[in-house]
């Protein structure tokens, strides 16, 4: 029932039509030959299979089956980057049209680092646009209620410094393409700069400070 899969981490190709990265597998023979996606920052786990089973598992040999138990699947192992996610959406939309199917995209990811959560991010805008075209997006309610990665604070100073940890390329041979999302308050001036440090806290490279007057959300 898996029609095709796009492994965005695998560089050997061939990439899907219209894209220049990753490797696509389409049809039973290619999917069986691939066996698995490329090891990456997420590691191997059962989360994708788990939620796919909830969405459309056949229930064979069990007392339970998924909601859309006769549906076909499109799979994407995507880079943790807004552009890559939107590429995945676009590829799925085109592939569903090719096969004459309605498209429902599952977003049970547990990722909260793809831009602001107020509907203005690039991913949110893509979802709005594709929803108007009839694509259905499904997401989980989340299970991070006891995690302490959200903060709310009013700072006395208007200049802040923050440390950002990147994924270790040496430990993740197939990792490439990382990004940082930053945004300011509508109608206020927002400036940002970026510096790279080594393990001894020595500055290796630093950008200028860029000031922007934000006039819209």
Feature names for model-found ranges:
Residues 78-155, 159-201, 210:
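Substrate-binding/access-modulating region of protease and related hydrolase catalytic domains
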Residues 1-5, 196-198, 216-217:
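Short intrinsically disordered, low-complexity coil segments enriched in acidic
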Residues 204-217:
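Solvent-exposed serine/threonine-rich low-complexity stretches and specific carbohydrate-binding patches
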Residues 1-85, 100-104, 132-136, 148-149, ...:
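Subtilisin-like serine protease catalytic core
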